[in-house]
Amino acid sequence: KVDKSLDSLNKEIDHFVQHVKDTKKNMLNAGHEISWNYEKKFLPKSFIEKQIIRVNDNVALLNHRDVLRLFGYTKGHYQRAVWRIDKFHEMVWFPKLYSNSDWVNRYDQETNTILQFRKDLKPHPIPPKDEHDRIVFAHQKNIFGQTVYKFYGIFTADHVKTDSVRHYFKRINTTIDLTKYF
């Protein structure tokens, strides 16, 4: 391990700060809007106003109710793992993408699939072929330790890989146009 001198470290930091400033300047010159407000980041209204959400936008909200507001929900807190939007043959799914008391849900970045199975490996009903598409907002902790629900995209059951124990869901879209829900 090589320790850096304080002067060397300061130069490295200055270089990185200049890189960030240059990147921001280039983005502004290209017409991109750059604004960041920590509180606004978690408001459903911010995303509804944008009208479209994308996986690459790192969309995360603080609770089920706030996520469901994106889809026209107007009631109080909601705690279930799934909320159906029958009008559009969709559902919002809130999987925990880590092992928990009863279920294991894993997201594979290489294949853009979610694997779901019971911890006891008991069979559970295979999703029907006409099941609603799943708009996935996964339960996770952000870098500040807050529980958030992060948008992973729209998924559908992969009936080729799914069996009665292991269910696979493949991502079919990384973008949602929210205007259809209002």
Residue ranges and their predicted role:
Residues 1-60:
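Catalytic cores and motor modules of nucleic-acid processing enzymes
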Residues 5-8, 114, 120, 171, ...:
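Acidic/proline-rich low-complexity IDRs
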Residues 6, 10-13, 17, 25, ...:
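Low-complexity, compositionally biased segments
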Residues 13, 35, 104, 114, ...:
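Generic intrinsically disordered, low-complexity segments enriched for polar/acidic and small residues
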Residues 21, 43, 52, 83, ...:
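Short linear sequence elements within intrinsically disordered, low-complexity coil regions
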Residues 53-148:
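Acidic, glycine-rich low-complexity segments with interspersed aromatic residues
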Residues 144-182:
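Compact mixed alphabeta submodule
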